[in-house]
Curated annotation (Swiss-Prot):
Organism, scientific name: Corynebacterium diphtheriae (strain ATCC 700971 / NCTC 13129 / Biotype gravis)
Keyword line: Chaperone, Cytoplasm, Ribosome biogenesis, rRNA processing
PRC barrel domain span: 91-163
Claim: GTP-binding is one of the keywords in the record: no
UniProt comment concerning the protein's domains: The PRC barrel domain binds ribosomal protein uS19.
Family designation: Belongs to the RimM family.
Stated name of the protein: Ribosome maturation factor RimM
Pfam family, one: PRC_RimM
GO cellular component, one term: ribosome
Record flagged with keyword Cytoplasm: yes
Task performed by this protein: An accessory protein needed during the final step in the assembly of 30S ribosomal subunit, possibly for assembly of the head region. Essential for efficient processing of 16S rRNA. May be needed both before and after RbfA during the maturation of 16S rRNA. It has affinity for free ribosomal 30S subunits but not for 70S ribosomes.
InterPro entries: PRC_barrel-like_sf (IPR011033), PRC_RimM (IPR056792), RimM (IPR011961), RimM_N (IPR002676), RimM_N_sf (IPR036976), Transl_B-barrel_sf (IPR009000)
Subcellular location: Cytoplasm
Gene3D superfamilies to which the protein is assigned, alphabetical: PRC-barrel domain, RimM
Length: 166
């Protein structure tokens, strides 16, 4: 199993740096100088070596040894980087990619599908696309989402009255 650890948002400057949106809790390990990142974009795979890294506006600015200029950096836009879980990644939580696509069950009925996860400072929110096409946000807390069954591909919710109508 591989985890997505970041995504190239855009190029930065003229020397080939890229801005990376980090999706891992270990950026200091995953994006260390000298690390080789495995990226995928549009069916192509890239192996890129980090030459330098620095924080910038809640993202990382990364310079790769293989990328010489802005034009080459622009070609990386949208590249997603993946890595194997670290040994300490094993816990009772869920990875975003495990939750995305789960059928959302309320009572005995499928009402929609998890389309994404938003991580907030206090709690995470499940983005759910209802059968009607409407999107709602559901707090990912045990009282509202008491059961997640990855094997069955389901997520049972018990929302308070009115939550699905917001």
């Amino acid at each position: 199993m591989e985890l997505m650890i970041g995504r190239v948002v855009k190029s930065h400057g003229i020397r080939g740096e890229v801005a990376i949106e980090v999706t891992t809790e270990e950026p200091e390990i995953r994006f260390a100088q000298g690390e080789v990142l495995n990226g995928r974009q549009g069916g192509k795979e890239h192996s890129l070596t980090i030459a330098s890294v620095r924080p910038h506006q809640n993202r990382l600015l990364v310079k790769f040894k293989e990328i010489a200029d802005r034009t080459a950096a622009d070609s990386l836009r949208g590249t997603r980087f993946f890595a194997a879980p670290l040994d300490d990644d094993v816990d009772d939580g869920f990875y975003d990619h495990e939750l995305e696509g789960l059928a959302v069950i309320h009572g005995e009925e499928k009402i929609g599908e998890v389309s994404g996860v938003i991580h907030g400072p206090a709690q995470s929110l499940l983005e759910v696309t209802l059968e009607s096409g409407k999107e709602v946000l559901i707090p990912f807390v045990h009282d509202i989402v008491p059961e997640v069954d990855l094997d069955a591909g389901t997520c049972v919710i018990t929302p308070p009255e009115g939550l699905l109508e917001l």
